[in-house]
């Protein structure tokens, strides 16, 4: 470790060199600024060239001249030249002036006057060394002269008198007040350390308070404070510096503590019992006064008493209140007493305070009862009204003399001594707001003195009130009673009834009647008046609800008119003066209860008959008409009917006859058959029920054309069902449906001109429920499914490793089971080359190579590419016997669109799993076509045998972001594929040679009812899987 020691020595030498080069150290110290009361950081510089002598300390309030010179400054430069020393700062050229002086030659600094630390605790002197030209030879020096503190300031309290409050019975050590004193001497020094002490307490006695020596907090010594004994304490507190030493300075202050009252004393009554007397039938506002004694502070809620009657006041004759000035309880008589009933009454009075009792004594309180005897004096009593008020009812409809002669009733007074009606009394009406009443002075009979208005303001809620007085002739005593009169409302309109039916049958006589009243509402009461003999016996009336009833009879009537008098009463049991007569006409009726002749029904009231004619109008002798008529709703319905009658010919003119179009593709809904492949069947395999069938692969020659079609389209869609190919003289599994929204173009073997209709170029059957499974389709199906599973395994790196099985202790009975875990063993893989097609996919997975399929035994028919521009258009109908029809037409050449700016190109290859002998067609981009083209290549060959190329025109060279994808489309030979849909949109015409040209072509994938084919990209579906994406920066154009 010698190198470590050597390193430390080198670092120490380097540090010393740096220290020698630097000329000074700066040290910061904390200094208090007395003038503005702030603390600042000052710097003390230690010079390498020592040219000062530290100043001596100075004591305040003393003559420090005997210590002169208190400091001396000297520079090394004085050896070579003459130096003048100068000083400046506080005490020199700033207040206080003239405290320090300096010898400019020797540099001695002297103090010349007495200093005060409380004014200037520190003097900062700036020293300079000047040459003869007045230039600084040294850096200016700061000289600090500290003034030493002397205990020359006594403590000073912030207040001369402190005032505090505290409740009596407070807990011990409760804070009362905090005293505060300051000392001008140096902080954090013994001269400024103050100690507090209680010197005296008034009133004298046991000390009740103590003070904290250092904080000045005054607290209680115990919980014995009692306001009833002493309500005020005066304390004399002294504060001494030097921590209370005898040589310290001190000052004193007064502390006045007021004891607050709490409700800790229970009130008691001055006497143990009370008594009083009063005459019967008299009231008293001050029957007796009860004095309560309470030691708490007067005028407060702790002192005010709250009186209560505990018992004896069964008739609520007495009340007791508190006089807040004297704290007395005033007993009042609020109801008259009866000597005959209660000659003596004994009360129990209790008292407590209005404020709650203090928690220290609340549990000890018990209310004590004080007895009070009330003696009732018997006197000769005057008359009185029993009951004190009486209600009378007035019959409605009374006017004039009948009202004046009507007697409401008699209201007389009784003699309380005897209990019989009073004799020597006279009656007069007292308060009568409307002056409507009069009374017989001897009998007390009450009558009306004038007519009155039932709508008068003196009538409240149908009730009129007045007073009656009974005056004793002997004693002059007066009794007062109240008269209440129920005034009925004027019934200006009688309840009017009317019948529902105008005629009744003789064998089933019943009619419904209704009541209408303007003044009073339901319920109404109905009764038949027996004016003529046996009227009430024949007719019976029953109420249905509050406003209607049914009039009926159980007897068989004779044909002819009938008059039934009916009396109707309202809810106040009032009715019209005369009963109302209902006129009915009994007639012979047929089986449908219809009268054989018309009749007239009316209502007879006295001399007036209200008749209802056939038109429903009620007349009063032909003069008055009722309010029955045609309303706005009826008029509106009539007008609406007339309008509909006039508009019906116009509506018939708008109707047109249309022929029913023949049913075609998509005109009816084809339900999924019961054996559809979209449903799992009992045989637990995908597809139709397995059948042993010999299905040969059909490969027929196809016709193609190199003619390029150009079309400008805005809304074009194409659906393609591809199976085996297009044949000459026959059709096998190809269907092309092209729909053009707005397009014009040329097609060989198809429709020409402006294509706006949906046409079927080549069609065949799409349902193959009775055919077998296409082995080529299964081959492609499982191959693509295996590729999809391989793609998923590539996305799972955690499973991409060799798995070693754990040894479980015993060997396997099958010895070769362990070899399957090592794929690196040498295996003879040559036998996999001769496997059947159904095992070819498994072999390709194991060998990681693509096995060439066996050559087809069927000869490949060459595709003819020399097709004329004008050719036949073949249509194949779906039937067992194929019928071919031929049509020729001349197409019109459409103008080519202008090339667009080069952009991205998406090229999509869609392969159809079918016979491997068909070669893929070629996509050719014409030079007139713009970029941004999506191209779909449809190949009638298995996926693994496709060997084509993509040709791109020259004008889209150097184009980036070319998207290339492969999709597998199921063959129509697969069962239940006829119900599937192929593609949503395909823009551009389909040529017979398989060439697709268009400004923007997009083909979507084939949709199939098969659940595996309908899976999305990157899933386990073998029919729709995306394999590779290649980006081309340069695409060469070639034509084949």
UniProtKB/Swiss-Prot annotation:
SUPFAM superfamilies documented for this protein: Cadherin-like
Organism of this sequence: Rattus norvegicus (Rat)
Domain free text: Three calcium ions are usually bound at the interface of each cadherin domain and rigidify the connections, imparting a strong curvature to the full-length ectodomain.
Chain segments carrying region Disordered: 1015-1040
Protein purpose: A component of desmosome cell-cell junctions which are required for positive regulation of cellular adhesion. Coordinates the transition from proliferation to differentiation in hair follicle keratinocytes. Plays a role in moderating lymphocyte migration to inflamed skin and maintaining homeostasis of the epidermal inflammatory response.
Segments in the Cytoplasmic topological domain: 655-1040
A GO biological-process term: hair follicle development
Name of the protein in question: Desmoglein-4
Compartment(s) of residence: Cell membrane; Cell junction, Desmosome
Disruption phenotype: Knockout rats show an increase in skin leukocyte population with higher CD3(+) T-cell counts. Knockout rats treated with topical imiquimod develop significant skin erythema, thicker skin, erosions, mild scabs, scaling, dermal neovascularization, vascular branching and vessel enlargement. Severe hyperkeratosis, parakeratosis, intense hydropic degeneration of basal cells, marked vascular proliferation and thickening of the epidermis. Increased exocytosis of lymphocytes and neutrophils into the epidermis and slight mononuclear infiltrate in the dermis.
Cysteine pairs bridged by disulfides in the record: none
Transmembrane segments annotated in the record for this chain: 634-654
Desmoglein repeat repeat placement: 883-909, 910-940
Matches recorded under Pfam families: CADH_Y-type_LIR, Cadherin
């Amino acid at each position: 470790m010698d190198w470590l020691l050597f390193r430390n020595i080198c670092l120490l030498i380097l540090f010393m060199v740096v220290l020698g080069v630097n000329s000074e150290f700066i040290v910061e110290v904390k200094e208090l600024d007395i003038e503005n009361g702030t603390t600042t950081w000052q710097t003390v510089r230690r010079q390498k060239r020592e040219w000062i002598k530290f100043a001596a300390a100075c004591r305040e309030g003393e003559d420090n001249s005997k210590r002169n010179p208190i400091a001396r400054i000297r520079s090394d430069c004085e050896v070579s030249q003459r130096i003048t020393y100068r000083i400046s700062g506080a005490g020199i050229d700033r207040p206080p002036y003239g405290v320090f002086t300096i010898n400019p030659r020797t540099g001695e600094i002297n103090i010349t006057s007495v200093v005060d630390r409380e004014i200037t605790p520190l003097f900062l002197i700036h020293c300079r060394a000047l040459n003869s030209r007045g230039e600084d030879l040294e850096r200016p020096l700061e000289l600090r002269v500290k003034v030493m503190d002397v205990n020359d300031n006594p403590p000073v309290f912030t207040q001369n008198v402190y005032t505090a409050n505290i409740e009596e019975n407070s807990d011990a050590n409760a804070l009362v007040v905090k005293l505060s004193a300051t000392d001008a001497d140096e902080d954090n020094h013994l001269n400024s350390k103050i100690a507090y002490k209680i010197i005296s307490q008034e009133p004298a006695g046991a000390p009740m308070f103590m003070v904290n020596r250092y904080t000045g907090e005054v607290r209680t010594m115990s919980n014995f404070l009692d306001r009833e004994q002493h309500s005020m304490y005066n304390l004399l507190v002294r504060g001494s510096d030097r921590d209370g030493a005898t040589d310290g300075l001190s000052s004193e202050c007064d502390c006045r503590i007021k004891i607050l009252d709490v409700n800790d004393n229970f009130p008691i009554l001055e006497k143990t019992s009370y008594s009083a007397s009063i005459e019967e039938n008299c009231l008293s506002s001050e029957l007796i006064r009860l004095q309560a004694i309470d030691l708490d502070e007067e005028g407060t809620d702790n002192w005010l008493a709250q009186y209560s009657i505990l018992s004896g006041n069964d008739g609520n004759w007495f009340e007791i209140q508190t006089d807040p000035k004297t704290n007395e309880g005033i007993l009042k008589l609020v109801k008259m007493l009866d000597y005959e009933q209660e000659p003596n009454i004994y009360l129990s009075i209790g008292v407590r305070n209005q404020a709650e009792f203090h928690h220290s004594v609340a549990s000890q309180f018990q209310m004590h009862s004080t007895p009070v005897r009330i003696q009732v004096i018997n006197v000769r009593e005057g008359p009185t009204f029993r009951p004190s008020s009486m209600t009378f009812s007035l019959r409605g409809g009374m006017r004039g003399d009948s009202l004046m002669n009507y007697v409401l009733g008699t209201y007389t007074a009784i003699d309380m001594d005897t209990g019989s009606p009073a004799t020597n009394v006279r009656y007069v009406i007292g308060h009568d707001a409307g002056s409507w009443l009069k009374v017989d002075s001897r009998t007390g009979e009450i009558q009306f003195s004038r007519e009155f208005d039932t709508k008068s303001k003196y009538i409240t809620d149908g009730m009129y009130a007045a007073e009656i007085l009974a005056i004793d002739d002997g004693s002059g005593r007066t009794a007062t009673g109240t008269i209440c009169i129920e005034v009925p409302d004027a019934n200006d309109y009688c309840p009017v009834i009317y019948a529902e039916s105008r005629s009744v049958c003789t064998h089933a006589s019943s009619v419904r009647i209704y009541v209408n009243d303007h003044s009073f509402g339901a319920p109404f009461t109905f009764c038949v008046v027996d004016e003529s003999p046996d009227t009430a016996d024949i007719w019976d009336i029953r109420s249905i609800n509050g406003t209607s009833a049914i009039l009926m009879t159980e007897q068989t009537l004779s044909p002819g008119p009938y008059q039934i008098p009916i009396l109707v009463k309202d809810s106040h049991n009032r009715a019209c003066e005369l009963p109302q007569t209902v006129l009915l006409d009994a007639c012979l009726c047929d089986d449908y209860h219809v009268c054989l002749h018309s009749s007239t029904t009316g209502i007879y009231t006295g001399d007036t008959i209200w008749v209802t004619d056939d038109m429903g109008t009620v007349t009063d002798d032909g003069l008055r008409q009722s309010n029955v008529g045609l309303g706005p709703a009826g008029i509106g319905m009539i007008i609406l009917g007339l309008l509909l009658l006039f508009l019906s010919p116009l509506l018939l003119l708008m109707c047109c006859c249309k022929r029913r179009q023949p049913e075609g593709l998509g005109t009816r809904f084809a339900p999924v058959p019961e054996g559809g492949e979209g449903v799992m069947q009992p045989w637990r395999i995908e597809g139709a029920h397995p059948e042993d069938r010999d299905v040969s692969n059909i490969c027929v020659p196809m016709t193609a054309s190199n003619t390029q079609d150009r079309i400008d389209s805005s809304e074009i869609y194409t659906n393609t069902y591809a199976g085996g190919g297009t044949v000459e003289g026959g059709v096998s599994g190809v269907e092309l449906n092209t729909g053009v929204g707005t397009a014009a173009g040329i097609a060989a073997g198809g429709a020409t001109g402006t294509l706006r209709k949906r046409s079927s170029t080549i069609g065949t059957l799409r349902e193959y429920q009775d055919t077998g499974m296409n082995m080529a389709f299964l081959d492609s199906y499982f191959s693509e499914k295996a590729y999809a599973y391989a793609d998923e395994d590539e996305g799972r790196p955690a499973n991409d490793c060799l798995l070693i099985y754990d040894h479980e202790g015993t060997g396997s009975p099958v010895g070769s089971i362990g070899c399957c875990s090592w794929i690196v063993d040498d295996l003879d893989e040559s036998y996999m080359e001769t496997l059947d097609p159904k095992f070819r996919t498994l072999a390709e997975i194991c060998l990681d190579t693509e096995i060439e399929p066996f050559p087809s035994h069927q000869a490949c028919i060459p595709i003819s590419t020399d097709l004329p521009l004008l050719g036949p258009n073949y249509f194949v109908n779906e039937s067992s016997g194929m019928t071919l029809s031929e049509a020729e037409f001349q197409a019109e050449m459409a103008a080519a669109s202008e090339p667009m700016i080069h952009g991205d190109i998406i090229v999509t290859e869609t392969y159809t799993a079918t016979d491997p002998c068909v070669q893929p067609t070629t996509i050719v981009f014409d030079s007139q076509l713009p970029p941004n083209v999506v191209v779909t290549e449809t190949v009638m060959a298995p996926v693994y045998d496709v060997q084509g190329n993509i040709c791109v025109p020259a004008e889209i060279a150097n184009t980036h972001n070319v998207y290339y994808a492969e999709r597998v489309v199921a063959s129509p030979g697969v069962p239940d594929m006829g119900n599937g849909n192929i593609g949503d949109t395909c823009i551009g015409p389909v040529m017979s040679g398989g060439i697709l040209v268009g400004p923007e072509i997009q083909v979507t994938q084939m949709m199939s009812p098969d659940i595996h084919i309908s899976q999305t990209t990157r899933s386990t579906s073998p029919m729709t899987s995306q394999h590779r994406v290649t980006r081309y920066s340069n695409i060469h154009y070639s034509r084949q």
